[in-house]
């Protein structure tokens, strides 16, 4: 499962590129060839995280 990733600058959905990186294990260089927008390229390069286990809820400390 790949969590949705949307570029905050242009609003483009770049989940498919994230899928290629995480699931298909393609290199970042190969994936960035098909990405035209500089803002999307930057987001993919800097904000890719591995899959997270969302069954554990983070604790919220209001103090």
Curated annotation (Swiss-Prot):
Its main location: virion. It holds the Pfam family Chordopox_RPO7. One of its GO terms (cellular component) is DNA-directed RNA polymerase complex. It comes from the Viruses. Its EC number is 2.7.7.6. InterPro entries: RNA_pol_7kDa_chordopoxvir. It catalyses: RNA(n) + a ribonucleoside 5'-triphosphate = RNA(n+1) + diphosphate. Transmembrane segments: none annotated. Keywords: DNA-directed RNA polymerase, Early protein, Nucleotidyltransferase, Transcription, Transferase, Virion. It is found in: Virion. Induction: Expressed in the early phase of the viral replicative cycle. One of its GO terms (biological process) is DNA-templated transcription. One of its GO terms (molecular function) is DNA-directed RNA polymerase activity. Part of the DNA-dependent RNA polymerase which catalyzes the transcription of viral DNA into RNA using the four ribonucleoside triphosphates as substrates. Responsible for the transcription of early, intermediate and late genes. DNA-dependent RNA polymerase associates with the early transcription factor (ETF), itself composed of OPG118 and OPG134, thereby allowing the early genes transcription. Late transcription, and probably also intermediate transcription, require newly synthesized RNA polymerase. The DNA-dependent RNA polymerase (vRNAP) consists of eight subunits encoded by early viral genes and termed according to their apparent molecular masses Rpo147, Rpo132, Rpo35, Rpo30, Rpo22, Rpo19, Rpo18, and Rpo7. The same holoenzyme, with the addition of the transcription-specificity factor RAP94, is used for early gene expression. Belongs to the poxviridae DNA-directed RNA polymerase 7 kDa subunit family. This is DNA-directed RNA polymerase 7 kDa subunit. It comes from Vaccinia virus (strain Ankara).
